[in-house]
Amino acid sequence: MGAIKVSAFVKAVPSAARGLLSDELRHFKVAAMPWLSQSYYDDKSIHYELVKLPSRYGENAWEMGLHFESKTAERNSALLRYFDRHLFEVRDALGDDWVAEIWDRGWTKVYVTFVYPVLTEELVAPTAERLAHAIRTLEPLRRLAG
């Protein structure tokens, strides 16, 4: 098992996920910081985020999800309400641990948290598959929501 830095991991996962998606879904852009990556289509404020959470959330905790971070809390709330109405479908596809909730600054999100006790290169592929599966499930709903 080869250790990997968080900054390399958050860049590698979206790149690997892209290859697992249909042509229609693989053309996203990526913005990265040392602790997170944001994969998005037409609006950067609506993105799929993979983030290493601060230690106050637990050691080696991660989050993956669809974040609604537009400048208007009303838009973010409307998107959250739409996804909340489809949460049974989302959980059926992605797992019961996915939640939809209000977050910070008027932002909202549909997400899951998980722990990787040790971050290794071998975790890139399964995490990319998890991200690709989330995009395949959530992006059609996001596009319908507007």
Regions found by a protein language model. Name each.
Residues 39-43, 109-115:
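Short, solvent-exposed polar/charged micro-motifs at secondary-structure junctions
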